[in-house]
């Protein structure tokens, strides 16, 4: 399969995929137990005792990497690399970036669809800045009843445009002033040196007043059941707040302005 990826991008994906995950050992041992269960139930045609002994020996050795046998290498000359499955849904986006070198892209979409995860992955692969819409919540004086009832207006898109997008469009450094939800105030500015590639991440990043600044836009979606499950795992105490408030606000914005249709590509992360 040819995705037209730059060799440097492929190399970075290979390297990042080799890095040990935080729960890598636990995940491996869970899968080993599943394997043993299948063998014990005669679903797989292997000796249970022999398999258990071999896997226990592998564990005692610290789970060293498994290689093809010398016989297999001599017969088939295998030559391949693996990338982590978390990168697979986004290969089309990587391809676009490698072939078009955009200056600014937007990642909009449903909550718990993986917007932050994607922006973090892109930052690992490319030399870029990431600016988050979550740093631009409304200030207290902006939270009028009229504004909060208007689709897409529960974010400070005016300040985001003036302080982030306009400087970036002029190839200027950015003075990032995050909104602090704990103090309900704007923090002191942080100087972010300009980079040729910038990612704007978060719901409402495709607000009509911001769209013209992007070279490319991505919409991430997720099915309802998976969305709720991810939100439950992320913060069970806030789940009802998301269901009753934030999700309806997002959906009103998406539907009123046909955001999904206006994005260049749509990616469903339900099975990612």
Where do the PLM segments sit?
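Conserved lysine of the Walker
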Residues: 115
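ATP-dependent NMP and nucleoside kinases share a basic, alpha-helical "lid"
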Residues: 186-234
């Amino acid at each position: 399969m040819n995705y037209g990826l730059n060799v440097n991008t492929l190399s970075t994906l290979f390297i990042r995929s080799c890095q040990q995950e935080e729960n890598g050992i636990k995940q491996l041992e869970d899968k080993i137990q599943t394997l043993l269960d299948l063998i014990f139930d005669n679903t797989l045609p292997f000796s249970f005792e022999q398999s258990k002994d071999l896997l226990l020996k592998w564990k005692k050795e610290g789970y060293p990497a498994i290689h093809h046998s010398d016989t297999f290498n001599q017969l088939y000359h295998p030559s391949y690399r693996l990338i982590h499955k978390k990168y697979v849904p986004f290969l089309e986006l990587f391809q676009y970036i490698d072939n078009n070198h955009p200056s600014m892209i937007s990642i909009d979409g449903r909550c718990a669809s993986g917007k932050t995860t994607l922006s973090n992955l892109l930052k690992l692969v490319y030399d870029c800045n990431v600016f988050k819409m979550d740093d631009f919540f409304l200030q207290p004086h902006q939270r009028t009843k009229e504004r909060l009832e208007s689709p897409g207006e529960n974010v400070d898109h005016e300040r985001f445009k003036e302080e982030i997008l306009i400087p970036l469009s002029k190839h200027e450094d950015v003075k990032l002033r995050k909104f602090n939800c704990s103090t309900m105030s704007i923090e002191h500015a942080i100087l972010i040196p300009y980079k040729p590639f910038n990612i704007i991440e978060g719901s409402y990043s495709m607000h009509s007043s911001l769209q013209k600044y992007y070279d490319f836009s991505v919409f991430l979606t997720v099915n309802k059941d998976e969305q709720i499950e991810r939100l439950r795992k992320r913060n069970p105490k806030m789940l009802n707040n998301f269901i009753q408030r934030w999700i309806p606000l997002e959906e009103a914005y998406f539907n009123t302005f046909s955001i999904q249709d206006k994005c260049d590509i749509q990616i469903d992360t339900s099975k990612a």
